[in-house]
Each structure stands twice: as structure tokens, then as C-alpha cells.
């Protein structure tokens, strides 16, 4: 479970996707681009935060 994940609007999500695509177009791997964007979002986000739980689907 992850606590304190930023709660993003659709527009904010779209901008994040576009930023990830830009980073990948510049040669960054998808994993690095996603990690960088997540770090930027956590550092700059001032809105609500959610708690998310991810479960392994194979169980």
C-alpha cells in the first residue's frame, strides 16, 4: 500500500503523460521517465493525496 499519492485531475494526468513522452523522445527509458515524473509530481503537488493499494493479481 502507498500512502500520500497525489490526487491528480484529468488535465494534470494528461500533462504528466505528455511530459513522460517528451522525456522518452529525448532518449530516456520509460521507467526512468515515469520515475522522474513521479518524483516531480510528489515534490510539486499541493492538492489532495490518496491512499492506493496494489495487489498481485496472481494470488
Curated annotation (Swiss-Prot):
Cross-referenced InterPro entries: UPF0181 (IPR005371)
Short name of one Pfam family: UPF0181
Signal peptide (residue range): none
Coiled-coil parts of chain: none
Family the entry assigns: Belongs to the UPF0181 family.
HAMAP family assigned to the protein according to its UniProt record, in alphabetical order: UPF0181 (MF_00507)
Protein name from the UniProt record: UPF0181 protein YoaH
